[in-house]
C-alpha cells in the first residue's frame, strides 16, 4: 500500500528541529531489551559529575565499539591474559557489539572491581564487576553494566541535544557522553583509590593504559571538541548513494517503526524488517550488506559491516552467517539469513517476538538516528516515538517517485540510488 504525498513533507529542516521531533517519549512494543526507560539527566545530576579542573574528557572513540574495538582481537587477548575467561569471548563480544561499547572498557572495569584478569578467584568470576551491578553471575553483570553504560551515554547525548535545541549552552564543563557514562557508573559503585584524589576517571584511565598500552594522548580528548561533536552529530546522515535496504535487490520486505537499538530511549537508530513477519519455525530469507565495507562477526547471530567513512550497519537475530572477520563486501552481498528459531536468533540471550532482522545505523561506533538517512531512493522520517507506525509521522519517502511507504507494508528494494 502506497500513499501519494507532497514532496514538501520530506523537505530538509533544521537538524535540531528533527532532534526535538525524534527524541524518545516511550514505546516498548517489540522491545529488544528489558523495557528500561531512557536514562534522564538533569542539571542537578550533572552538577555531581564534574571533572576535576585539570582533567580532560575521555575519548568517545575508545569508549564506543568503533575502529579501535574492531581492530581488537578479544579472543586472542583473553587467551593470553585471561585464559579463565576465554570461553566467555563470544558472550563479551556479542553484548559489547550489541550495545556498541568497546570491550576494552568492560575489561578495564573488571580489573578495577575484581582484580587482575589472569587468575580470577571464585568471587571474581561470580561478580566480575563488583558493586557496579546488583545482578548476580558473570553473564548477568556483564550485560547489566554494558546496558547501564549505553543508557547513560545516550541519555547524556539526548540531554545535550535538548539543551542545544532550547538554545542553552552545552559542553561548557568539558564533560562528554563517554565521561558522563563512566563517571556516573563509577561514582555509584566503584572503589576509588585515594591516590587518584577521588577522581574515578583518573583510576580508569591509568588502568586502561596499563592493560592495553594506549597513549594518554589517544585516551583523552580536548574539552573544546565536545560542543563541536554535538553539532556535527545532530546533522549526521550518510551519503545518499551509500546504502540500500538490507535485503536482496528485487525483493520486498516489511519494516516496522523506527526505534532505538534497545527498543526504548534515544536515538531512533534501528528498524526491524521481515519478509512476512511469520511465527517461529517458518521459512526466513537472505540478509544482505546495505553498503560496502569490512565485516565484523560479533557472534553466531550478529554481524556488523563498517564502511571506510565510519558509517556502519548492524545485523542482529541472524543465522547461517556466511561472512568472516575482515572480509570486504559490497552492497547486496549476502551475510546470512534472519533466524527462524528463537534460540538461534537469541544466541547469547535476550528477547524477540518472532523471526525478523534487527537493523541499526551507526557512525564511528555510535548509534545515530535514521532521520533523513537514505536507503536507495527511500529517505526515512522516523516519527516521534519508539515504534511509531503512524504513516503521518513514520515513513519511507521515495525521492524518485514521490511516494510515501508505511510501516508493515511491502517495501521494494531497487538497490543503491543512482
UniProtKB/Swiss-Prot annotation:
PTM remark: Processing of pro-LasA can occur extracellularly and requires elastase (lasB). Secretion and processing may be linked.
Consequence of gene disruption: Loss of staphylolytic activity (lysis of heat-killed S.aureus).
Compartments reported by the entry: Secreted
One GO BP: peptidoglycan catabolic process
Induction: Optimal protein expression in vivo requires both Zn(2+) and Ca(2+) during growth (at protein level).
Keywords on record: Disulfide bond, Hydrolase, Metal-binding, Metalloprotease, Protease, Secreted, Signal, Virulence, Zinc, Zymogen
Pro-piece positions: 32-236
Record-annotated disulphide pairs: 301-347, 391-406
Active site: 317 (proton donor/acceptor), 356 (proton donor/acceptor)
EC top class, as a word: hydrolase
Coiled-coil boundaries: none
Cofactor note: Binds 1 zinc ion per subunit.
Binding site residues for Zn(2+): 259, 272, 358
Cofactor: Zn(2+)
Phenotype upon changing residue 356 to A: Loss of staphylolytic activity; mature protein is still produced
GO cellular component term of the entry, any: extracellular space
pH-activity relationship: Optimum pH is 8-9, inactive at pH 6 and below.
Gene3D superfamilies: Glucose Permease (Domain IIA)
Job of this protein: Involved in proteolysis and elastolysis (degradation of the host protein elastin). Has staphylolytic activity (degrades pentaglycine cross-links in cell wall peptidoglycan), preferring Gly-Gly-|-X substrates where X is Ala or Gly. Enhances the elastolytic but not proteolytic activity of elastase (lasB) and elastolytic activity of other proteases. Degradation of host elastin is likely to contribute to the pathogenicity of P.aeruginosa.
Protein name (Swiss-Prot/TrEMBL): Protease LasA
Amino acid at each position: 500500500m502506497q500513499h501519494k504525498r507532497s514532496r514538501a513533507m520530506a523537505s530538509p529542516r533544521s537538524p535540531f528541529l528533527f532532534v526535538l521531533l525524534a527524541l524518545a517519549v516511550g514505546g516498548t512494543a517489540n522491545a529488544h531489551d528489558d523495557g528500561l526507560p531512557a536514562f534522564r539527566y538533569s542539571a542537578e545530576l550533572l552538577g555531581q559529575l564534574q571533572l576535576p579542573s585539570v582533567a580532560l574528557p575521555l575519548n568517545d572513540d575508545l569508549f564506543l565499539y568503533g575502529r579501535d574495538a574492531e581492530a581488537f582481537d578479544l579472543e586472542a587477548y583473553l587467551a593470553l591474559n585471561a585464559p579463565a575467561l576465554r570461553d566467555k569471548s563470544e558472550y563479551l563480544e556479542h553484548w559489547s557489539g550489541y550495545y556498541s561499547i568497546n570491550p576494552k572498557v568492560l575489561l578495564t572495569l573488571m580489573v578495577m572491581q575484581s582484580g587482575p584478569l589472569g587468575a580470577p578467584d571464585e568471587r571474581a568470576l561470580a561478580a566480575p564487576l563488583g558493586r557496579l551491578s546488583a545482578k548476580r553471575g558473570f553473564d548477568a553483570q556483564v550485560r547489566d553494566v554494558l546496558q547501564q553504560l549505553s543508557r547513560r551515554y545516550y541519555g547524556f547525548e539526548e540531554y545535550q541535544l535538548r539543551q542545544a535545541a532550547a538554545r542553552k549552552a552545552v559542553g561548557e564543563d568539558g564533560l562528554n557522553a563517554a565521561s558522563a557514562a563512566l563517571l556516573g557508573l563509577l561514582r555509584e559503585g566503584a572503589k576509588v583509590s585515594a591516590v587518584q584524589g577521588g577522581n574515578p576517571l583518573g583510576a580508569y584511565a591509568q588502568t586502561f593504559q596499563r592493560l592495553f598500552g594506549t597513549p594518554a594522548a589517544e585516551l583523552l580528548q580536548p574539552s573544546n571538541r565536545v560542543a563541536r561533536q554535538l553539532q556535527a552529530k545532530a546533522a549526521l546522515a550518510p551519503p545518499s548513494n551509500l546504502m540500500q535496504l538490507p535485503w536482496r535487490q528485487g525483493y520486498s520486505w516489511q519494516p516496522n517503526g523506527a526505534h532505538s537499538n534497545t527498543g526504548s530511549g534515544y536515538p531512533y537508530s534501528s528498524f526491524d524488517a521481515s519478509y512476512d513477519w511469520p511465527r517461529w519455525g517458518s521459512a526466513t530469507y537472505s540478509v544482505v550488506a546495505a553498503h560496502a565495507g569490512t565485516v565484523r562477526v560479533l557472534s553466531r547471530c550478529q554481524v556488523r559491516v563498517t564502511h571506510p567513512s565510519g558509517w556502519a550497519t548492524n545485523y542482529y537475530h541472524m543465522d547461517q552467517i556466511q561472512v568472516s572477520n575482515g572480509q570486504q563486501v559490497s552492497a547486496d552481498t549476502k551475510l546470512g539469513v534472519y533466524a527462524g528459531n528463537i534460540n538461534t536468533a537469541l544466541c547469547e540471550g535476550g528477547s524477540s517476538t518472532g523471526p525478523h532482522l534487527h537493523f541499526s545505523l551507526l557512525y564511528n561506533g555510535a548509534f545515530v538516528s535514521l532521520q533523513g538517512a537514505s536507503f536507495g531512493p527511500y529517505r526515512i522520517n522516523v516519527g516521534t516515538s519508539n515504534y511509531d507506525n503512524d504513516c503521518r509521522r513514520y515513513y519511507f519517502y521515495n525521492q524518485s517517485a514521490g511516494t510515501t511507504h508505511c510501516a508493515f507494508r511491502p517495501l521494494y528494494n531497487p538497490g543503491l540510488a543512482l
